[in-house]
Amino acid sequence: MSLVHEVQSALNRLPIPSHTPQTLTAEAAGQHLTLHLDGVDSLACGFVLLEFESQALASAGIEQLKQVAEKLEKRLTYLLEPISPIEHDAEHCVVQLRSNPPQRNEDRTSYYELLVSRGGRLSLARYAKQVGGVRQPVSSHVTREVLLRLIGDFAQVAS
């Protein structure tokens, strides 16, 4: 069974509606997903952090991680904002992508942050920052269909 099917099955087993934080894990074909949910209903879910790990990228160097980041930039066009690489750190072997441009209103900026890291780890979170404040993690609200597509894209790019 594919990782997407594993996640879909796990989502279908969760009680709905639920606004209780819960962690969903799934594994298939050398890929592991941990999804930190803060809400689930029949149509959508909210997650604070999506963590993905791929054995195929376990020994990847910075150049291969940059290629993964570029592929994700091209595929993840359905998020609230487009994402693009903003920084890479060869010493720590990590590529950072963010919403470009972020979502802004009068007193708040919100954006996605995607890290492609050593060991085949990818993580996606959404942050918000009030004017004059520090950034805080916030929930990413997506339909179940978009969540499964996102996981499928991570799995495809990281294989």
Regions found by a protein language model. Name each.
Residues 1-76:
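Charge-rich, low-complexity N-terminal segments
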Residues 13, 78, 82, 156-157:
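A structural signal for alpha-helix termini and helix-coil/disorder junctions
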Residues 26-28, 99-104, 126-130:
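Short acidic, glycine-rich loop/turn motifs
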Residues 27-29, 40-43, 84-93, 117-118:
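Short, ordered beta-strand-loop transition motifs
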Residues 31-38, 109-118, 122-124, 150-151:
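Short, structured motif recognition centered on aromatic/hydrophobic residues
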Residues 38-41, 89, 107, 153:
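Acidic-enriched, low-complexity/disordered segments with a strong bias for Aspartate over Glutamate
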Residues 46-113:
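The feature represents the first ordered module of a protein
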Residues 120-159:
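Mixed-charge, glycine-accented linear interaction segment located at domain edges/termini
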